[in-house]
């Protein structure tokens, strides 16, 4: 096999998924708290904006790299409040994270019409043309082979199905860019050490963000996977971006 990036380090492709799994297993219990602290709560607003990309909740939705379930559970609550007939599958390769999502769904009484499946984004255990929406938030950056995951997304979506991705991106404005770089590399790992007892995990986080393709480059990757009507929308000056596309 070939070497790939694990943060700024080069590792064998076959080892990368294990390394990432190990990181998320170690920080799973502090994951939600760290998201609030690192983003100063902004991730909640980003996710609220993200779910606006899924207008039809009478749908079959696959949420990949679900983590602790924030996106899927927001959709489940919205559908429940509206009386929609939603069908949700939460999928993550990390069982500890998925177990946290299960617990949250029970605590929030949102477990109806939800399935939890441990699965690899590069090899999804679903039939072709199965879902109306494929959602992934802050997850595709951690997939060893992003192109393979995009092709799997295309495969499992129904014709006219929608791909929606929320991911950290590239800040272009000068002052914000400089501040964001300083905050990412100097503050976030320190918060990770204090709160989660794991500086290394959050060093990986900021390094993986720095290496992720720009908005335009990722748009090209999505299009080359077969999608059409590929667009992105920057939030918070490009700290994150929402990418959307259709299988036509």
From Swiss-Prot:
Which is one GO molecular function term here? 2-methoxy-6-polyprenyl-1,4-benzoquinol methyltransferase activity
Q: What class of enzyme is it?
A: transferase
Which positions does UniProt annotate for S-adenosyl-L-methionine binding?
68, 92, 120-121
Catalyses which reaction(s): a 2-demethylmenaquinol + S-adenosyl-L-methionine = a menaquinol + S-adenosyl-L-homocysteine + H(+); a 2-methoxy-6-(all-trans-polyprenyl)benzene-1,4-diol + S-adenosyl-L-methionine = a 5-methoxy-2-methyl-3-(all-trans-polyprenyl)benzene-1,4-diol + S-adenosyl-L-homocysteine + H(+)
* One GO-annotated biological process of the protein: methylation
Any Pfam family from its record, for instance, is: Ubie_methyltran
Superkingdom of the organism of origin:
Bacteria
Alphabetical UniProt keywords: Menaquinone biosynthesis, Methyltransferase, S-adenosyl-L-methionine, Transferase, Ubiquinone biosynthesis
Q: Give, as in the UniProt entry, the pathway in which the protein acts.
A: Quinol/quinone metabolism; menaquinone biosynthesis; menaquinol from 1,4-dihydroxy-2-naphthoate: step 2/2; Cofactor biosynthesis; ubiquinone biosynthesis
InterPro entries given for it? SAM-dependent_MTases_sf, UbiE/COQ5_MeTrFase, UbiE/COQ5_MeTrFase_CS
Q: What is its EC number?
A: 2.1.1.163, 2.1.1.201
Assigned protein family: Belongs to the class I-like SAM-binding methyltransferase superfamily. MenG/UbiE family.
HAMAP family for the chain:
MenG_UbiE_methyltr
Purpose:
Methyltransferase required for the conversion of demethylmenaquinol (DMKH2) to menaquinol (MKH2) and the conversion of 2-polyprenyl-6-methoxy-1,4-benzoquinol (DDMQH2) to 2-polyprenyl-3-methyl-6-methoxy-1,4-benzoquinol (DMQH2).
The protein in question is named Ubiquinone/menaquinone biosynthesis C-methyltransferase UbiE
UniProt organism field: Rickettsia prowazekii (strain Madrid E)
Top-level taxonomy: Bacteria, Pseudomonadati, Pseudomonadota, Alphaproteobacteria, Rickettsiales
């Amino acid at each position: 096999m070939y070497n790939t990036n694990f943060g700024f380090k080069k590792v064998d492709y076959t080892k990368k998924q294990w390394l990432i799994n190990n990181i998320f297993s170690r920080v799973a219990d502090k994951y939600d708290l760290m998201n609030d602290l690192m983003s100063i709560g902004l991730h909640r607003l980003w996710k609220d904006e993200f779910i606006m990309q899924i207008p039809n909740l009478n749908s079959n939705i696959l949420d990949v790299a679900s983590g602790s379930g924030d996106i899927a559970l927001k959709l489940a609550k919205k559908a429940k409040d509206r009386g929609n007939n939603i069908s949700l599958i939460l999928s993550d390769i990390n069982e500890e994270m998925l177990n946290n999502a299960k617990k949250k769904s029970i605590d929030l009484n949102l477990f109806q019409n939800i399935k939890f499946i441990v699965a690899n984004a590069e090899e999804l255990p679903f039939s072709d043309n199965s879902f109306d929406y494929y959602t992934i938030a802050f997850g595709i950056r951690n997939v060893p082979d992003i192109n393979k995951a995009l092709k799997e997304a295309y495969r499992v979506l129904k014709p006219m199905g929608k791909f929606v991705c929320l991911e950290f991106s590239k800040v272009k404005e000068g002052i914000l860019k400089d501040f964001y770089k300083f905050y990412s590399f100097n503050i976030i790992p320190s918060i990770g050490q204090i709160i989660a007892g794991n500086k290394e995990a959050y060093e990986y986080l900021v390094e993986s963000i720095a290496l992720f393709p720009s908005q335009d480059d990722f748009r090209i990757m999505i299009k080359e996977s077969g999608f059409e009507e590929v667009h992105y929308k920057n939030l918070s000056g490009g700290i994150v971006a929402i990418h959307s596309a259709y299988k036509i």
